[in-house]
Design a protein with these regions (language model features):
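Helix-to-loop junction immediately C-terminal to a conserved catalytic motif
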Residues: 19-50
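Non-catalytic C-terminal accessory region of glycerolipid acyltransferases
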Residues: 1-15, 106-250
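A transmembrane-helix-recognition feature enriched in membrane-embedded lipid enzymes
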Residues: 10-30, 67-72, 85-93
Length: 250
């Protein structure tokens, strides 16, 4: 019987999906820089930009950090994804946990794990193509409070290429969830279009860790830190875009 940790993750390393690993290497051709900024031990909150219908960015970061830096990554996801039959258990198996302050604190502070969050939330994946690579507001700074309370550093990870794999052209809303309608959906149809991604070259840059331990947790200070981190990531992303010669070849 497969062994799992208390979060439901398979304990024999990240379960391997051959097709996804092949896509990581040969389809998206993911390249990293700044991996020395990933802490070798202890908890850390990884913060990244977010994009696309059925976004692969989370899985790419999880797989990449484990392959390149040797540490597993737990990802926090909206509770709505766990409402579908069997999906929740499958997500848990690959290290995805319901996004909740208590879960984040236990992973970071008690278990000293790397935890990945996307502060843009749904605003990232559902933004129009005209806003491509413009980072949306980082909520109310909840991720900053999470890192402060867990006494761990924040490590920004900037992804370039993910928004070209599934360009958003519209969106629909179901309850409190919003779903992007992508160009892939239009070309490949409602089912295949959710999974077929264009072969954009993806680059990931890990920025220097940000230590906020001991800082004031007042709302205004938290919001200032969140905006400062968003601005730093946007600047890095702008630099990466400026250097890029082709969205398909990097």
């Amino acid at each position: 019987m497969e062994k799992r940790d208390r979060w439901g993750r398979a304990t024999e390393g990240t379960p391997k999906i051959a097709l996804f690993e092949a896509a990581y290497r040969s389809w998206f051709r993911v390249e990293w820089e700044g991996l020395e900024n990933i802490p070798e031990e202890g908890g850390a909150l990884l913060v990244s930009n977010h994009a696309g219908m059925m976004p692969v960015d989370g899985g790419l970061v999880q797989l990449g950090v484990e392959k390149e830096a040797g540490r597993p990554v737990y990802m926090l996801a909206h509770h709505g994804f766990f409402a579908f039959p069997y999906v929740g258990r499958l997500l848990n198996r690959f290290g995805t946990v319901v996004a909740h302050p208590n879960n984040a604190h236990r992973l970071l502070h008690e278990d000293e794990r790397l935890v990945l969050v996307f502060p843009e939330g749904e605003k990232g994946p559902v933004k129009p193509t005209s806003e491509r690579y413009r980072l949306q507001r980082f909520g109310r700074g909840g991720f900053v409070e999470t890192a402060m309370r867990a006494q761990v550093p924040i490590v920004p990870i900037v992804l370039m290429g993910t928004e070209d794999t599934t360009p958003t052209i519209a969106r629909i809303s179901v309850g409190d969830l919003h779903y992007p309608i992508t160009l892939n959906f239009v070309i490949f149809g409602p089912i295949l279009g959710q999974f077929a991604h264009f072969p954009a070259k993806i680059r990931a840059r890990v920025l220097s860790p940000i230590d906020l331990v001991g800082r004031s947790e007042s709302r205004s200070v938290v919001m200032d830190h969140a905006e400062s981190i968003r601005s730093e990531m946007q600047t890095a992303l702008d630099e990466m875009i400026a250097r890029r010669e082709s969205r398909w070849f990097g």
